[in-house]
Amino acid sequence: MEEIKALYVDLNKLRNIGIMAHIDAGKTTTTERILYFTGRKHQIGSVDDGTATMDWMVQEKERGITITSAATTCLWKEHRINIIDTPGHVDFTIEVERSLRVLDGAVAVFDATAGVEPQSETVWRQADKYNVPRIAFMNKMDKTGADFEMAVQTMVERLGAHPIPVQLPMGAESDFAGVIDLIEMKAIRWLNPEGTEMVVEEIPTQWKDKADEAREDMIEKIAEVDDEIMEMYLEGEEPSIEQIHAALRRITIAGLGTPVFCGSAKMNLGIQPLLDGIVRYLPSPLDLPPVKGFDKAGNEIQVQPTENAPFVAYAFKIQTDPYVGKLTFLRVYSGKLEKGSYVINTTKGVKERVSRLIFLHADKREDVEYVRAGDIVGVIGMKSTITGDTVCEENTYVILEKMEFPEPVISIAIEPETKDDETKLSKALQSLLDEDPSLRAYVDQETGETILSGMGELHLEIIVDRLKREFNVNVRVGKPQVAYRETITKDVKIEGKYIRQSGGRGQYGHVVVQFEPLGLDKTFEFVDKTVGGVIPKQYIPAIEEGIREAMQVGVLAGYPVVGIKATLLDGSYHEVDSSEMAFKIAASMAFKEAMEKGNPVLLEPIMKVEVTTPEDYMGNIIADLNSRRAHIDALENRGHLRVVKALVPLSEMFGYATTLRSLSQGRANYTMVLSHYEKVPEKVAEKILKG
């Protein structure tokens, strides 16, 4: 029990952090070492041999990349650190967004041989969007090609960041011997391979000049963004160690700069100073502005991070745990929650029971009696709550801002192999859909096949893999299909009438709707401009719903419709015969006619592709991209490599990984994220529509 008691710390000693990085920068290894040095893990796990604690799903162990954000808690110098492990592969940026939503701070891990890589840019921009304060760790300082100054410079060039190195590496590659702490002006070395014996000593003579110069540079960089240090700097005063720490904390929390540490997680070098940095510079829940929420009337309210306020929490992740069933991860923003109590899911308007509360350490669990503001906890017992929902104590009503999930861009048809698989499939899919809002599933009415849509080939591969492993459902998988969309290109005004009279009560719905193109970055907007009660208010939501439902199937080839603004102008109703259903049908009839008359076109997803390659292969790679209808955006140098940035239709990118490997003898790699949708060229559209 001692261990659990120790987990309850004052709120100012709590750090909720994420570790974010590019796929191979060493994020999982860094997390592992943090758990090792904070005493929560006694044998060091390694991704290379598949024993890392955070990567607890079997697929992750095999692929060596982190997929699911597991939440882990550990202790360091009387502080408690909750770590949300974030994935580093571009197909999982949704997971990253979801975890950033509930973090207070983050450690950005970079590979010192490569600096900022494409996926790091994506993740960094997401962290900017959620205003997450960050410190940085230049990892792999012992690797051939490690170059600390170059790596820091890439943070300026590619991220527009304001990095402030607080350490200087002593040597690099195989000569990497330790770090110089530029604040205390001491050298730190590690004496044993486990990294547990750390010595702090005077800076070796050969490093003295470089350290003085680096410290001067650090003070200047702090002064640029901190008034207090700037004043001292201008007056020639030397700030004290405490003043530097305080300034770095202010700068980090305000998002004005990023303290940079360095080391090698794999070799156990530099982890303790990084932990000190997490505690010193990253915010506690008290350092951040209160979270915004909305009351019943839609007025904005602030949720204060205090134990005495009513309980409010946000569900940021659902996992189906092999041992305990459905686990709902909550970030508690205010108040206190005891196990066995009831809460209200305000998003859905349902009551939920909290059977057990669990602190997680990757796949180990500790039951606790209660949780408080600031905590991250796994809850057992919630039935209806899914990702993005708000839960509150009874008699309290708050809804926190919802997360927006991107539209899927790729689909596959799956077919159960046996009758037994068929019966298990829908339950298994429901579990996966609860966990992952970026996954969609529906049954194709014409073919009867189940269609899965997701963020990329890897995303869907892993879902199919999980169906097999976790739910024991074997499926046959069709070829990946592009998630095309349809839209209109001109304004149309349509009347939709649904009238049925056949003895007894009839049906009557009548609407006049103006449909217009809205721009392809938006899905749908509905405006009610009726006046004088021509259609009673209670039927308006049914009209919107009728259009929304009809938008699932377009007229060209049955693809979902996007980019539509529908303005309800007029209509009429019948005292007896009108019903929600009648108006819903009238609205969907109007929409179908609008699609036919509004010059419908087919849209395709255009992907932002970045290929990183040695110079020798660049010509062939560009030629190949051009043959895929690519629009080459930019060519850049990145160290000794070249980067090709291009916009390419997703339909041309299937199997690209294999082609790229053969074009570059396996030396080039690429990342791909959705950029936007655009009209399919006519010749290509003809082929698609012919099927």
UniProtKB/Swiss-Prot annotation:
The lineage of its organism: Bacteria, Thermotogati, Thermotogota, Thermotogae, Thermotogales. The gene is fusA. GO terms for molecular function: GTP binding; GTPase activity; translation elongation factor activity. It is found in: Cytoplasm. SMART domains: EFG_C, EFG_IV. This is Elongation factor G. GO terms for biological process: ribosome disassembly. GTP binds at residues 21-28, 85-89, 139-142. Belongs to the TRAFAC class translation factor GTPase superfamily. Classic translation factor GTPase family. EF-G/EF-2 subfamily.
